[in-house]
Amino acid sequence: MLSEGEAVDSIEPYRYDGGPVGVLLCHGFTGSPASLRPWAEHLAGRGYSVELPRLPGHGTTWQDLNVTGWPDWYRRVERSLLDLAERCQQVVVAGLSMGGCLALRLAQEHGPLVQGLVLVNPVVTSADKRLLALPVLRLLRPSAAGLSGDIALPGQDERAYDRTPLRALWSQTKLWQLVRRDLAMITQPLLLYRSASDHVVDATSAPVILSGVSSPDAAEVVLRRSYHVATLDYDAPEIFSGSTAFVERVTTKRNRGLPR
């Protein structure tokens, strides 16, 4: 767990200036760059330019997160996308959980800049009926119990909050609505990793995404040994190698013969 005020290197933003292909990584709600840092370092080691920003309100205290909303988080990843697009010839966007939702929104609003999408346990909806009470509950209670640490592999720490700020959670549901509405705008190649046992994001989001996008090249990979934070779990090596192959495939044609 991330204690209040704790600051360690793994929760800081990560940037690597590599070759002409860039990858933007977006972390999830109440999480931090720590959940994606090994993935970022793997991609950097393969020569890609990498951006892993820290979303506003994250990596400090849950109270800080509760005074932010989805437009704040989106603007941060949007800046990173535009920065990568200035430095690179092609960009692939990837995300974990809410980060996957942000990645989809970037592809919807900046389609020409996004060559492909890699989503790990993305969330765009939920069957949890308790969320129906959020419009009122967010005004009565500041937070609820957190959902961090859903990792099967012992000894892993995603550096996330142990409380869920309810105003911020309500804002996230508004982002879900926008992304679901515009799913048909997604035409980019898409690789979706889904954990068979996920105790944070239920099974409703993946089929909504896969049936809603217009991508002719969309694939789902089921992870059998990992929980929600699969990027720190048993199947992380599969995600790292599979996403690297995906990035190479969707960017190779345009960049063939260019230095890496």
Give a label for each model feature.
Residues 39, 188, 202-211:
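Short alpha-helix in the alpha/beta-hydrolase fold that links the catalytic acid
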Residues 40-62:
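Conserved alpha/beta-hydrolase
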Residues 49-51, 207, 211-229:
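Catalytic histidine neighborhood in serine/cysteine hydrolases
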Residues 95-99, 103:
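Gly/Ala-rich beta-loop-alpha elbow adjacent to hydrolase catalytic centers
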Residues 118-128:
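Active-site nucleophile loop of the alpha/beta-hydrolase fold
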Residues 165-183, 188:
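Active-site nucleophile elbow and catalytic-triad environment of alpha/beta-hydrolase enzymes
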Residues 186, 192-194, 198:
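Short beta-strand/loop motif that positions the catalytic acidic residue
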Residues 224-260:
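Catalytic active-site module of serine/aspartate enzymes centered on a nucleophile-bearing elbow/loop
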